[in-house]
A protein has these predicted regions:
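Short, charged juxtamembrane terminal tails flanking transmembrane helices
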Residues: 179-181
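Mature extracellular "passenger" or substrate-interacting domains of secreted, surface-exposed proteins
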Residues: 21-158
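Short, threonine-centered small-residue motifs that mark membrane-proximal processing/anchoring sites
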Residues: 2-21, 150-177
């Protein structure tokens, strides 16, 4: 009886376990697609440097359904500025499934995440087949075709200007006050 329960538990655990798709989140050298570098630059054109800038991988079944996966990671410093440390990210999609992915980066001083930041940038959306499927699980997929990109600021805030009527009323008021003296 104990053997039967143990076998049933193993079968249920095996059925319940679903392989998750995996991606190598990297934009430099051997860890990036085809050994190419995809440096991320700031608004000034300088490579992003240090924890003041963050990057995160966005994945979805289609380009219109991209959602953040994994944790935001800071950019490296010094000669490696503009690049993130390579890591494996597990997605919410099944291994072996087709997916759309993009790398997004932002200035952490302008917002806590990509959506909140006013200085931010995104790579082009890439189509990949996720790793992690099969038995044994396939190796994580590289970001084949990832190209470098730059951050863009929101620009100066729009300052509303007074309407013509308001300017006319202010001018008339000034003339009225001047005339009273």
């Amino acid at each position: 009886m104990k053997k039967l329960i143990a076998i049933a538990a193993v079968v249920v655990a095996t059925i319940a376990a679903q392989a998750q798709g995996t991606i190598n989140f990297a934009n430099r050298g051997a860890f990036a697609a085809n050994g190419t570098d995809a440096k991320v630059l700031g608004v000034s054109g300088a490579p992003l440097d240090g924890a003041g800038f963050m990057a995160q991988l966005y994945v979805g079944a289609s380009a219109s359904s991209l959602a953040a996966v994994g944790s935001p990671v800071p950019f490296r410093t010094g000669a490696a500025a503009g690049f993130v440390s390579a890591s494996t990210v597990t997605t919410g999609l099944a291994g072996g499934a087709a997916a759309s992915v993009a790398m997004r980066a932002w200035d952490a001083s302008t917002g806590a995440n990509y959506d909140a930041a006013t200085t931010r940038g995104s790579s082009a959306v890439l189509s990949v087949v996720l790793g992690g499927g099969g038995s044994p699980p396939a190796v994580p997929v590289d970001l084949a075709g990832l190209a470098g990109f730059s951050l863009a600021g929101a620009g100066p805030a729009n300052i509303p200007e007074p309407s013509t009527v308001a300017l006319g009323l202010i001018g008339a008021g000034a003339l009225f006050l001047r005339r009273r003296k």
